[in-house]
């Protein structure tokens, strides 16, 4: 069995019951004594030495170690699992604990029943379920279900093909003098020139968490092309073009074209 995280297993012998502990490999995680104690207590073991268990875990390095936890032969028990969910309810992990000597592995039906008990209804990772038919990793959080995040909506985008923020600067004449009366407040435009292009909004798509609850997407900002005289709007409502030669300006979101310079 391939593994990285440290794990433990109950071994039942003729002279009593033992706990086998296996060291982590590479960058695997060490066992948390609280997890081991909680498991043993849930299985009905009492009277074992927590200090001895702690010392055993501290000594655990490259080879597995064994500690006796009871002088009696425990009744065999099957593999078990717990379900752990993320705070955002978008992912669920399954954490397996090995069967004792003589115990059985969980079946696919039992694993699915465990998910159902925890009300995990959406996003079960079938490739993981398939792998669990032949492979086990213990004391390790294995992703078993994932929610679907909402697809963000996108706002309408309007692109203008002229200077929408002209600078009110005086015009410099050929002789070097300055004409303060001729301020450049307009942009010249020719007949047929594109003035503005609209990219429609994308409504996005709602998501769903592992409990089957819909997650709404954000609301997009929807805009339309606004325009005055001397301008043509395309049939699909996405393009403005000038009908005349003149000046173009943008005022309060509306495009205006004047046929006089």
Name every feature range the model reports, one short phrase each:
Residues 1-261:
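Long, low-complexity, mixed-charge
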């Amino acid at each position: 069995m391939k593994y990285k995280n440290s794990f433990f297993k109950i071994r039942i012998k003729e002279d009593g019951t033992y706990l086998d502990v296996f060291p982590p490999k590479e960058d695997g995680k060490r066992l948390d004594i609280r997890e081991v104690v909680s498991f043993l207590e849930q299985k009905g073991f009492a009277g074992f030495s927590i200090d001895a268990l702690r010392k055993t875990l501290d000594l655990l390095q490259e080879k597995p170690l064994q500690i006796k936890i009871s002088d009696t032969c425990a009744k065999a028990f099957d593999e078990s699992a717990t379900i752990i969910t993320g705070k955002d309810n978008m992912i669920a992990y399954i954490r397996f604990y090995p069967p004792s000597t003589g115990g059985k592995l969980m079946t696919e039906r039992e694993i699915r029943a465990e998910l159902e008990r925890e009300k995990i209804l959406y996003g079960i990772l079938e490739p993981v379920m398939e792998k669990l038919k032949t492979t086990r990793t213990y004391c390790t959080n294995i992703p078993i279900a994932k929610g679907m995040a909402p697809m963000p909506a996108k706002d309408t985008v309007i692109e203008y093909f002229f200077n929408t923020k002209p600078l009110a600067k005086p015009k410099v004449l050929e002789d070097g003098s300055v004409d303060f009366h001729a301020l450049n407040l307009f942009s010249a435009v020719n007949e047929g020139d594109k003035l503005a292009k609209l990219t429609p909004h994308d409504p996005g798509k709602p998501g769903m968490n592992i409990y089957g609850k819909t997650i709404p997407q954000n609301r997009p900002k929807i805009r339309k092309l606004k325009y005055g005289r001397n301008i043509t709007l395309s049939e699909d409502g996405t393009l403005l073009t000038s009908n005349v030669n003149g000046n173009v300006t943008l005022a309060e979101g509306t495009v205006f074209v004047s046929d006089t310079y």
